Amino acid sequence: MTSSFTDYCKFFNRILSEVQETQEQAIIKGAHLVSEAVMNGGRFYVFGSGHSHMIAEEIYNRAGGLALVTAILPPELMLHERPNKSTYLERIEGLSKSYLKLHQVTNKDVIMIISNSGRNTVPVEMAIESRNIGAKVIAMTSMKHSQKVTSRHKSGKKLYEYADVVLDNGAPVGDAGFQIANSEIYSGATSDSIGCFLAQALIVETLHLLVQQGFEPPVFKSSNVDGADLYNDKIFNEYVKW
């Protein structure tokens, strides 16, 4: 019996290589927005519904992470309560404005909104309302997928059309693009794993820019390294907001 592991690795690495070749300037542009916000007293907010919330969590309160990141994580848009709940709710109007108000997002801030398809009401509305506030918007999405589907928002537009910067995760239409041999089954979704890579790359570039400009960014250490708790508690108390 043959294994699919090597073929899947090749499939995944093709997408990762494409992202490496095409997304550097978007990462740099996004990092400039975030670093400027930080130096001017702003914050970096991150939001994703469904599985995309994992990317928001990846850079929130994380070892090596910027303490000025705030993840917007409404439990009703995650998967731990009922799997289909977020699917239904992210198509409803009016939620995004409440989330932004609850987290006190301002015109000093940058928000990254993550949606693989970029078509559903909540992420599109989140981008519109963020822009209305005056915050800068970074979209993380799949351009291959988003450009192949219609919007579910009343504007007829998708997330990337309201963004100042677009990070393209390179995922194929439908996300799960690896075909199981001798079948019509597609699996191996990549949007979250590549998305986490892009999110970490954005943080790394942001920290690079801040240090270059003489700004000492507050960065967490791993809580599982001896002696880190006291350091992290100080950082947390001074900078973390939720």
UniProtKB/Swiss-Prot annotation:
Residues 34-217 form the SIS domain. One of its GO terms (molecular function) is carbohydrate derivative binding. PROSITE patterns: SIS. Signal peptide: none annotated. One of its GO terms (biological process) is carbohydrate derivative metabolic process. InterPro entries: RpiR-like_SIS (IPR035472), SIS_dom (IPR001347), SIS_dom_sf (IPR046348), SIS_GmhA/DiaA_subfam (IPR050099), UPF0309 (IPR022951). PANTHER family: PHOSPHOHEPTOSE ISOMERASE, SEDOHEPTULOSE 7-PHOSPHATE ISOMERASE / DNAA INITIATOR-ASSOCIATING FACTOR FOR REPLICATION INITIATION. NCBIfam families: PRK02947.1 (NF002805). Belongs to the UPF0309 family. This is UPF0309 protein BH3325. It comes from Halalkalibacterium halodurans (strain ATCC BAA-125 / DSM 18197 / FERM 7344 / JCM 9153 / C-125) (Bacillus halodurans).
